[in-house]
Amino acid sequence: MSRRISLREFQENLARRLAEAKTGERRGLLGIQAGSENWLLDLAETGEILTPPALAAVPLTRDWYRGLANVRGTLYGVVDFSRFHHGAPTPAVGSARLLLIGARLGVHSALLVTRVLGLRSREDFEPDSGLADERPWVRERVRDMQDHPWLRLDTSRLLAHSAFLDAGTD
């Protein structure tokens, strides 16, 4: 079911999009949902978005490490991003997607996310004055125009963090 918006909201959104088209501004953020959290990633830090392929299980790994995905001959380590944050496991069906990250850093990693929420503009958000997030890979907390909380992901910090790199069980 689609969200109902007022005529005023529609006109404001349309005017903003037309202004962006004239000035050449791009929507530089990708919105994703992982469990109950909404995340924003810089488009420059992301790769392809895929329907989850068959995953090869890897024994003796943490429950958030879902296995390996073969994407056109390249193996990607797949992390259930919701489960990594102690959320519910993400079923690899329906609207779930595999988001390839880290190629610019020489890392073949993929995040299994609940759904992709589309492209966003930085102007769609304002800083959240609430508490800071303790996770070092959270660049900042922001809120959209409907006052929903979002988290900006710093993929290079995530990919370099020991909690993310240590997928093996103890």
Residue ranges of each PLM-predicted region?
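An acidic, low-aromatic, low-complexity terminal/linker signal
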Residues: 1-170
